């Protein structure tokens, strides 16, 4: 971490000496490219290697710093078999008066995080995980909290004006295919010493949820989602990808009925309030985001719960936890029928200049993120005696379930999940107010949410 921060500081100093203090920002025209290598490591997925590319079309420059259209492409590979492919497009000119944002994403994850439902009601044994990493004689326990998932996303979003430059309608179609199940132990154990391999006779949490009936037979394995999204948006941001002031408020419903091809139908909604408060204009900004995602009715398939639903140039992301939602918290730590999360951060653009005919800036960020389960997913033991080959196996499974549940928070009408909070800081490289490379570190306040995480990614969260 220290080496990374020192290297980043050296880059800032060197480019500041080369560059000129910015007086009049260069208005960009035509096509601008933003390539970036994607390199990371995960103990269960292995090394990540890949690349991403942002393409911005500013046309004649009339709308700069907001582009007429933009492409985002990414391909990443992990040494133990996981892959990520992303292709999204966002244009304001293809359809007159309508913003069109299609995208296709394929994620093949051999070791996806799975910590159960309802936040702290699902106990995370961080001591056992640490023992598996630090004790040479103990097997790695982290695969216990993993599942395998292949996820295909195809979407097409449309946005049009109701009141010029302020109020908009939103509509979209989404198609998702989920294939989810237990991990492939051979792939997860690949390259590990025999004593560190996750044993075949130890069930993962996902496998236990199946045995206890928390994840039903109908939902096990995944399914198809086909549905519409309908919503409204109020947007007064001065710059879309790097705002200094304004409001950005959205509310939309997700409708995935059976007759449209959805395997396990559901209906959900998402409300998001974002506010950008200029303290020193174009230098220091207080930005915060409040989100509430709920389920209409009392049920939704477990595999749709982790996602933060979005319109526009991006696509639905795993949450809550991770770079796009709650930085520093383990990915998918908070899943429930209804969840809420917040982000609050100070953004200080401490230097800006022009270099090689590009507008360059560096920004420091201090932040706090958090999430909470508001309405719980049903975690009751649903199996019957007839589901087991003997009463002894039934009793053993029931006792195992009771022991597991006794370690977490017990839900009742007045006692919901506690806040999962993190704090952290980051540095961003900003080119032409659109291509943004972020270096951030987040630390949870509770070890039940992990030990913290360092991210190298693109853009602002919001």
Report residues per predicted region.
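C-terminal outer-membrane beta-barrel translocator/porin domains of Gram-negative envelope proteins
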Residues: 228, 239-356, 376, 395-396
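Short loop/turn motifs that connect adjacent beta-strands in outer-membrane beta-barrel proteins
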Residues: 20-31, 59-68, 94-99, 163-169, ...
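Outer-membrane beta-barrel translocator domains and adjoining extracellular loop/strand segments
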Residues: 65-66, 84-87, 112-120, 181-188, ...
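Surface-exposed extracellular loop regions of Gram-negative outer-membrane beta-barrel proteins
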Residues: 51-73, 229-272, 424-430, 435-440
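Hydrophobic, lipid-facing positions within transmembrane beta-strands of outer-membrane proteins
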Residues: 33-35, 49-51, 83-87, 150-156, ...
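Gram-negative/organellar outer-membrane beta-barrel architecture
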Residues: 25-33, 41-224, 320-324, 448-462
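Transmembrane beta-barrel strands of outer-membrane/channel proteins
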Residues: 39-41, 51-55, 71-77, 102-110, ...
């Amino acid at each position: 971490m220290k080496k990374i921060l020192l290297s980043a500081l050296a880059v800032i100093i060197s480019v500041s000496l080369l560059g000129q203090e910015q007086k009049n920002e260069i208005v960009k025209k035509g096509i601008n490219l933003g390539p970036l290598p994607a390199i990371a490591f995960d103990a269960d997925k292995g090394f990540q290697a890949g690349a991403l590319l942002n393409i911005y079309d500013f046309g004649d420059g009339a709308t700069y710093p907001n582009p007429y259209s933009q492409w985002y492409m990414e391909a990443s590979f992990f040494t133990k078999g996981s892959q990520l492919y992303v292709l999204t497009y966002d244009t304001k000119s293809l359809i007159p008066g309508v913003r069109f944002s299609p995208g296709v994403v394929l994620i093949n994850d051999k070791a996806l995080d799975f910590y159960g439902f309802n936040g702290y009601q699902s106990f995370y044994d961080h001591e056992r995980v640490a023992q598996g990493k630090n004790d040479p004689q103990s097997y790695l326990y982290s695969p216990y909290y993993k599942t395998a998932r292949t996820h295909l996303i195809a979407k097409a979003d449309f946005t049009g004006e109701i009141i010029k430059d302020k109020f908009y309608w939103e509509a979209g179609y989404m198609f998702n295919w989920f294939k989810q199940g237990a991990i492939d132990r051979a792939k997860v154990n690949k390259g590990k010493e025999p004593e560190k391999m996750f044993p075949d006779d130890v069930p993962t949490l996902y496998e236990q949820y199946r045995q206890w009936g928390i994840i039903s037979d109908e939902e096990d394995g995944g399914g198809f989602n086909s549905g519409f999204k309908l919503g409204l948006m109020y947007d007064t941001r001065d710059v879309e990808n790097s705002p200094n002031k304004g409001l950005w408020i959205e509310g939309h419903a997700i409708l995935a009925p059976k007759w449209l091809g959805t395997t396990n139908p559901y209906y959900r909604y998402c409300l998001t309030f974002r506010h950008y408060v200029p303290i020193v204009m174009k230098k220091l900004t207080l930005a915060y985001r409040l989100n509430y995602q709920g389920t209409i009715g009392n049920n939704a398939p477990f595999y749709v719960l982790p996602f933060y639903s979005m319109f526009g140039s991006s696509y639905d992301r795993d949450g809550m936890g991770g770079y796009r939602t709650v930085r520093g918290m383990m990915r998918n730590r908070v899943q429930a029928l209804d969840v809420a999360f917040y982000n609050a951060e100070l953004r200080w653009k401490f230097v800006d200049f022009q270099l090689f005919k590009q507008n360059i800036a560096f920004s420091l960020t201090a932040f706090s993120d958090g999430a909470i389960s508001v309405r719980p997913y049903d975690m009751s033991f649903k199996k019957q005696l007839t589901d087991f080959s003997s009463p002894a196996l039934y009793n053993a499974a029931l006792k195992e379930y009771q022991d597991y549940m006794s370690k977490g928070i017990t839900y009742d009408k007045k006692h919901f999940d506690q806040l999962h909070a993190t704090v952290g800081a980051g540095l961003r490289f900003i080119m032409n107010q659109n291509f943004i490379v972020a270096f951030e570190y987040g630390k949870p306040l509770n070890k039940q949410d992990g030990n913290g995480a360092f991210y190298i990614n693109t853009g602002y969260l919001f």
